[in-house]
Amino acid sequence: AGKKYGSAYPMGARMMSGNSVHHQQLERDLSAFVSKEDSILLNYGYQGVLSVIDALVDRKDVIVYDSECHACIIDGLRLHIGKRFVYPHNNIENLKDQLERATKIVKETGGGILVITEGVFGMSGNMGALSSIVELKKDYNFRLFVDDAHGFGTMGKTGAGCGEEQGVQDEIDLFFSTFAKSMASIGAFVSGNADIIDNLRYKIRSQIFAKSLPMPLVVGNIKRLSLIKNSPEFKNKLWEIV
């Protein structure tokens, strides 16, 4: 791909001259792998998460997040001009308290609640309490955003991440991962329902106002994802070493 397209092609943002069938193929492959309707490619994980959070919420919305979320999430939260509440790491009882507070606010503002956590927390290595958080959807109305940068490719039967590992993949509204961990590459993606992802395509500033992911990385990531899907021995070897 590098010889064919060079290191910079395509030039321009995805919405302009930066789209290609390869970008679209990678998005379809990622969506199928993590069991979501649609996906959007991001140039970098840090920049991508920050921009996704900014695009998802406005001043009427409330964000509730785990205290050990990655710095990229924290910086995304700093852009939020509405309310945000933190709960102690994996403390579900305190999360309930924060959801109660958030629910009262959005009843007045007409907004929504976004809960943000991680699949595998990078500093501690433990998993987010995804199954317990999903249970709370029975009593509270919120969307769940999971940064599974460390779980993608390493957790779950197929490597689809911690949602698959805990049996709640379908209940994750927005699934994010970078390509920098299990795929040893550059770039990232976020997956979810088609209407949410389509909305992001027109609102996510880090992609609208930047050139798209270069073709050698896109084609390479298609191959690397194929290796994750079709060569489980790599994941199995990782766990043997661990």
Residue ranges and their predicted role:
Residues 59, 79-81, 140, 171:
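Short, structured coil segments at secondary-structure junctions
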